[in-house]
């Protein structure tokens, strides 16, 4: 499954770009455990440098006046100017957010929904280049 994502973007001279989109703070135990194992494994599978961009949705949600659109704009502002090679929403809220705003943020980028409860994805049709690892 990860190998399929690894082959999508072809050869590049610049490091690949992978977005880890956390539902909660990165120090949240299950997110941290996943990311700690995932980053080196993905780097090993790609066999080339990867720049990991890590964004937590919780910080944006703590602002009571933040609308979903303002959160989307905040996420967009952290993304690199170059195209992402992989988007990895971690947890249910991040998966729902990524699927909802996929067209505005990363319409053609492969997405690996990680550590997601089935209830967060069962009623949403995945894009052709989406894969979910549900719990």
Question: Where are the language model's segments positioned?
Answer:
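Short hydrophobic alpha-helices and adjacent helix-cap/hinge residues
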Residues: 2-135
